Amino acid sequence: MASVVMVVSGASVWTMKNATPHPTGFWSEEFVTPHRKFADAGLKITIASPGGVTPTVDPLSFNLAYNSNDAGKVKEQQDYLKRLGSVLTSPTRVEDIKADGFDIIFLVGGHGPMQDMAVHPTMGAVIVAMLDNPKKIVAAVCHGPAGLLTAARSDGTWACKDRQLTGFSNDEESQAGFAGNAPWLLEDRLRISGGRYVSKAPWAPHAVVDGNLVTGQQNYSAGVTADAVLKLVSVTV
């Protein structure tokens, strides 16, 4: 049985450029959809957060505008999260996870990762070790790729340099109303760091696979990103 550790942000606020705190956390759909798909496929799932803190759901992720104006979809996500109970509210500490303990690491999005996962002191070493093992899979969706920025090798080079990848685009950040006050933009940082960033039209489902690295553009890409991971599992794990 393949195993996956799903990493969710432990942040409940995102500090904006003007120093104001914006309520945030992990994005519901970007956790629920992959978790359900992984569970249905029989994967052994572990949930982790920085410090093992109880993660906060980004309140915006239940907004109808980000859920195809489908109230039923929002209710389904809320019910799914409630059913997980202590599995979600008492996660493993990211600091305790090891690369040899899992086949897959999946970084869940929401603006929370911009606050904590992007600067996590130990997660990067796990990501590097897994990227360097062709039998392991590293995946991230939406703002989850912010966590990939920690994956520096001992010589200082970024482990995702020259890899094709995606994540929340500048256009999407602008349309969501955060670009002007964001401390930095994910697309810009991925490009500057050396990634071969690619995207589709805003809000279109889009997943990119480059070897054992799988990334999804935004919340509507959660399903196709999880599907791409499961397809890789069938041939690598």
What are these regions, as identified by a protein language model?
Residues 1-135, 146-237:
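Extended, subdomain-level signal for the structured scaffold at the beginning of enzyme domains
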Residues 138:
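Conserved, well-structured core segments that form or line functional sites
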